[in-house]
Amino acid sequence: MRCMLTAGALVLAGCSPAFATWSIMALDQKSGTIVVASAACVAPQDLAGVRAKDLMDIQAIVVPGKAVAVAQGSFDSTRETQKLMYTELVKGTDLEHILEMILRQDPGVGMRQVAMLAVEGRRAGFTGPATSVIAAHDQGQVGGTEIWYSVQGDNFPTDEVVPAAVQALTDHKEDLAERVMTAMEAIDAKGGDRRCSCASEPKPSTACETRTAHVAYMLRADKSDSNRESYNDGRYAMYLSVSGDHIKPNENPNPVKTLRMRYDEWKRTRPN
């Protein structure tokens, strides 16, 4: 399933500033493992302005062993969309019905981008007509596996970005998180968000060659993990977050590259 639209009339009600974001979700039906990763050209102080601790806090919806979703584009700062998605995903509501509920109830839906995956192999996605000039989503199954994926984003430099990410994820043969990390790198290599660069504010304090986002994260939830009170506040098997204002001198000012560094270190040091 693929969707690509051009920007249309803005729907302002309930919308935060239009942040450019890309994300990748994948789940393994056999193990129940879920992985979601994302990067955005949004400064940390702008996330604080919508009362978000980080990008994941306002974007990801995680139901361990069952479903995963993202709500992005112009983030719903009221979090009503995120709460609705989580409540219905927990209940096992049909994903297309959840999408219909969002389209009917969210006054800012024209600037939203939402996507959902359920462990049964169900998926649904929507890219609002006012998200950006180049915005797209693509969902499907990795051939010969029980892995399902969803790739989505806006403000891409070309329409080649999402297909490159899908190819990277489907061609890679390692575990689920490595597939997602490789797809994140494919988007980064294609230019990520076209508005971000080494010169965009806030500028990095160390030498910078390329930068396609200000923040990034990756989360892996195993079937045995659980949430506490909210839609993404659980104790998960892995959670790595990169913010431009907390990148170390020995790391890369490009959050996607630093996410790779931290992920590799996590793999190296985790118990077998």
Residue spans for each PLM region:
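N-terminal nucleophile
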Residues: 19-272
